[in-house]
């Protein structure tokens, strides 16, 4: 029985989950909920089901795998990673994975707060000034390793890929000074399952955010 992944019909928090499901050749189906247009931004597709799915903390995204019903994007990522032994093999690798997981969420929320802010255009110039330091930290942490935890792919590479790609879309020159990050993106996109998925009709690169956002909302 295929797993069910539920989320809005956008990239959002679910991009790394979709990529991980594809990489692991998992059997899954998507339930993509549509949001209405302005001014009401109707969310009834989701709200009509929200409390009928048996979720402990009803929210999007959710993953239903048989009797297991999981919400919170990183909880879903960790669940899938444990199933497929992608959490890191040594304590050092698991520590690195934990750090990257939380760093990615910090940087994700910073971009979200900007892009959903009514003063987006006014605040964007100052935000752009902070990006080089963010990218520098990722570059130094990755170093000469092929993957963020070490020599093998782990679930945090899917998270890192997503956030670096989002920032790269937001500011196309932000990785120019960090060749190891550009190489990482290319290496990730070159993974056989990932490459095939990105060429498929199921792949959703944009919009990154919902219709309520000021950027990448359609």
Curated annotation (Swiss-Prot):
> Where does it mainly reside?
cytoplasm
Which segments constitute the GST C-terminal domain?
A: 90-208
Residue numbers binding substrate: 116
What is the E.C. number?
2.5.1.18
Q: Which InterPro entries match?
A: Glutathione-S-Trfase_C-like, Glutathione-S-Trfase_C_sf, Glutathione_S-Trfase_N, GST_C, GST_mu, GST_superfamily, Thioredoxin-like_sf
Give all residue intervals belonging to the GST N-terminal domain: 2-88
Keyword Ribosomal protein in annotation: no
Single annotated GO MF = glutathione binding
Entry superkingdom: Eukaryota
**Pfam assignment, any one:** GST_C
Which parts of the sequence carry Phosphoserine?
Answer: 67, 205, 210
Keywords on record: Cytoplasm, Lipid metabolism, Olfaction, Phosphoprotein, Sensory transduction, Transferase
Further facts: Yb subclass selectively binds steroid hormones.
Q: What does this protein do?
A: Conjugation of reduced glutathione to a wide number of exogenous and endogenous hydrophobic electrophiles. The olfactory GST may be crucial for the acuity of the olfactory process. Participates in the formation of novel hepoxilin regioisomers.
Q: What family, per the record?
A: Belongs to the GST superfamily. Mu family.
Its assembly, as annotated, is:
Homodimer or heterodimer.
What is the protein's name according to its record? Glutathione S-transferase Mu 1
Species of origin reads Rattus norvegicus (Rat)
